[in-house]
Amino acid sequence: RKHKDPYPGGYVKEPKVGMTEWVTSFDLNSLYPNLIVQYNMSPETLIRGGDDFTVSGVDHYLKNAVTDEPRQRNLSVAANGSMYSKEKRGVFPTIIIGLYEERAVIKKEMLRLKQENENANTAELKREINRLENTQQAIKILLNSLYGALGNQYFRYFEMVIAEGITLSGQLSIKWAEQAMNTAMNNILKSDDDDYVIAMDTDSLYVNMGPLVDAMKPKDPV
């Protein structure tokens, strides 16, 4: 594939038209960084070669499990069919895990200082809280930027196959979440394959909880 060829992005479901009173949103936390770690995606872990790369696609993996052969070879398979060795953790997943752990420590300390500030309420504490907030936000941006760099032809480790593997695996994840949500709602409400997900965008889905609220609310509310 040429450097300037486009590749699929995040999945966006056309929103259902109309007003919905009870809507709940669900978000897949740090979707792209977590996918890089899950599949061990990194330039040096990518299996290169014609026979090892079989394009399957999101719709295929929504209905079919990965065959046993990749598992036996200790490989992960992304939604575009690209394969990655899991013999050793890749450089990119290692970077992401390190940043993720660092951000968790910073957020924990920030929460502690916020609780302390409720009693003390000093300018020094507020400055430190702001510093920690800015630091964790910077790390969040850094985590999310790695995927974008992989799809940038001017990046030293540019790899279109990995970038596409991330976005299509993201589509697969959010569509799996949609299926699971609709299955759960239909089972609870005894409905027949109704679609309760009214909108989706990349890593988020929005669910119509109105029928569930109506089914659970008392007949004579106070």
What is each residue range found by the language model?
Residues R1-V222:
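Conserved acidic
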